[in-house]
C-alpha cells in the first residue's frame, strides 16, 4: 500500500477521502489547518498533521509520499478575490512544488466545474474549456488558475490528474445541503424558475472511491481533467423535495422568476457588503444562478478512462445525510 498525503482533510471532501483511503489500507497523512476538525479522523489509521499550505514549510508533509490528493481549497459563493487566490492558487502552487521536490509520483487535484458557470442553461458539458473574457465569480477564476498550475507541473514531469466534481454532498456537508436548509429556515423556499432547472450532484462516497481508483489508473496523467457527478441529472424541485422529506421538514415551495431572484440576491449582496465583516448573504447571484439555470456534465471520460461507476444514488445519499444530521447536529 502507498503512503499518501491528503490536504484539506479537516474539510468535508478531504475528510471523506482521507478516511476512505485509510480504511483501504493506505498509510495516510491527513493535513488540515484545524485540529478540532481533523479529530474527526481519530478513529482511523490516518496520521493527523496541522499545517497551513500558504505559510508553513511543506517538505515534512510530502516527504516519502507516493501520491498527494489535494483537496484543500477555499470553496464559497462569497469572498474576496485575494482570499480565493491565496487559498486556491498560492496553496496549490506551493504543494505542487513541495511534491516535485519530494519525488511524489502522482498528484490528484480537486478542481471544480464552476469554471463553466454562466447565467444560461448548459447540458452535457464536457471537459473542454476556454476561459471567459470576464469571470462571473472570483472563486471560479481561482479554481481555473489552480488547474493551470497543475498542468504546468505535469509538463515538468509530475503525473497529475484533475477531478471536477459537481455539487458534492453527504455526511458532514457544510455547504450544499446546509445552505438549502438555511434558506428554508423561514418556512418557505424560493424555487427559482419554478425549480425546473436540471442539475448534477455528487455523493461524497462516490467521489472518495474514484480518488482511490485514480491512484493507480493507467492513464496519461498529463494534468487532464475529468468531470464527476452521480450521472443522474435531477430537477431542483425534485432535489429539495427529497431533501426536506428526508429531514422531516414541512417547507412551502414558492416559485420565483429568475429575474426577480437575481435582483433579490443583488440587493442582499449590497446589504452584506456594507455590514461589519461583510457576512455572506443568504442569497447570492451565483447561488441563484446555480439553482435557476440547468447545468449537467458529461462524465463519459471518467467512466471510460477511470472506470468510474457511482454506486450510491442521490436518494440514498440524501438519506445518509439526513441520518447523520439527526444523530450529530439535531440530536
Predicted regions and their residues:
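N-terminal Rossmann NAD(P)H-binding glycine-rich loop of SDR-like oxidoreductase domains
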Residues: 4-24
Amino acid at each position: 500500500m502507498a503512503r499518501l498525503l491528503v490536504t484539506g482533510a479537516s474539510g468535508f471532501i478531504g475528510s471523506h477521502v482521507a478516511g476512505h483511503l485509510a480504511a483501504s489500507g493506505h498509510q495516510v497523512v491527513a493535513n488540515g489547518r484545524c485540529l478540532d476538525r481533523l479529530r474527526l479522523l481519530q478513529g482511523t489509521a490516518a496520521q493527523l498533521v496541522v499545517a497551513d499550505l500558504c505559510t508553513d514549510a511543506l517538505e515534512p508533509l510530502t516527504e516519502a509520499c507516493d501520491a498527494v490528493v489535494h483537496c484543500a481549497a477555499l470553496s464559497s459563493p462569497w469572498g474576496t478575490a485575494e482570499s480565493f487566490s491565496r487559498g486556491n492558487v498560492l496553496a496549490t502552487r506551493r504543494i505542487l512544488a513541495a511534491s516535485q521536490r519530494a519525488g511524489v509520483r502522482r498528484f490528484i487535484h480537486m478542481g471544480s466545474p464552476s469554471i463553466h458557470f454562466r447565467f444560461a442553461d448548459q447540458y452535457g458539458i464536457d471537459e473542454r474549456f476556454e476561459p471567459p473574457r470576464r469571470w462571473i465569480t472570483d472563486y471560479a477564476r481561482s479554481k481555473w488558475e489552480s488547474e493551470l498550475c497543475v498542468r504546468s507541473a505535469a509538463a515538468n514531469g509530475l503525473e497529475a490528474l484533475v477531478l471536477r466534481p459537481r455539487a458534492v454532498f453527504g455526511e458532514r456537508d457544510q455547504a450544499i445541503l446546509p445552505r438549502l436548509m438555511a434558506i428554508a429556515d423561514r418556512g418557505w423556499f424560493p424555487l427559482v424558475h419554478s425549480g425546473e432547472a436540471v442539475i448534477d450532484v455528487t455523493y461524497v462516497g462516490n467521489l472518495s472511491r474514484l480518488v482511490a481508483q485514480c491512484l493507480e489508473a493507467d492513464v496519461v496523467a498529463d494534468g487532464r481533467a475529468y468531470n464527476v457527478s452521480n450521472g443522474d441529472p435531477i430537477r431542483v424541485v425534485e432535489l429539495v423535495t427529497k431533501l426536506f422529506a428526508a429531514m422531516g421538514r414541512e417547507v412551502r415551495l414558492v416559485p420565483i422568476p429568475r429575474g426577480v431572484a437575481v435582483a433579490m440576491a443583488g440587493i442582499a449582496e449590497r446589504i452584506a457588503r456594507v455590514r461589519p465583516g461583510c457576512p455572506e448573504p443568504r442569497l447570492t447571484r451565483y447561488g441563484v444562478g446555480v439553482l435557476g439555470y440547468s447545468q449537467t456534465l458529461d462524465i463519459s471520460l471518467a467512466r471510460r478512462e477511470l472506470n468510474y461507476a457511482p454506486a450510491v444514488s442521490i436518494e440514498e445519499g440524501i438519506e445518509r445525510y439526513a441520518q447523520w444530521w439527526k444523530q450529530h447536529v439535531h440530536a
